[in-house]
A protein has these predicted regions:
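Loop-helix junctions at membrane interfaces
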Residues: 1-159
């Protein structure tokens, strides 16, 4: 009886350690991928494409949406420690919120529909949520905060949603 309890406790600890190690490794991979950002043509300099969401999606699909959000957060912290910030933290907050808007819905749907179809539906849903949330956050919160932080004028009459 006591060996069953001991084995159960050991298995729980091993699973927790394995999850922490996986989160750390995926966050490190995402951070390295984030270093290779591609600027978008015809867009402001702070809009860039990076492939750092791929390992986060892998982690989200294998360990759940909470782990995906944790990987996203650690990636942002590591990138902040390596590169610092040129956006007074607004870009890092934007990256975290918009990244979570992609991976959390994808992870939640995949958790309910554990199949290739569920992964595809999750990624499509995550992309749609990320697009709408990104537009809203950029228009009403992030860009005004960025403009205020750098004392730049911003004409809010240009925003029509």
């Amino acid at each position: 009886m006591s060996t069953d309890v001991t084995n159960s406790a050991t298995n729980k600890i091993s699973a927790r350690i394995r999850m922490i190690a996986q989160v750390g490794m995926l966050a490190a991979i995402a951070t390295v991928l984030m270093l290779f950002e591609i600027p978008l043509p015809f867009a402001p300099a702070f809009y860039e494409i990076d492939f750092s969401e791929v390992p986060i999606l892998v982690g989200c699909f294998t360990m759940g949406p909470l782990a995906g959000a944790a990987i996203e957060f650690i990636k942002i912290l590591l990138n902040f420690a390596i590169n610092g910030t040129m956006t007074a933290g607004v870009g890092e907050i934007a990256n975290f919120l918009i990244g979570c808007a992609l991976v959390v819905p994808a992870g939640l749907i995949y958790k309910k529909m554990h199949s290739r179809k569920g992964a595809i539906i999750g990624m499509i849903t995550g992309t749609v949520v990320m697009t709408f949330l990104g537009c809203f956050l950029n228009a009403y919160i992030l860009l005004p905060t960025y403009a205020k932080a750098f004392e730049m004028p911003m004409d809010l009459s240009l925003i029509h949603i």
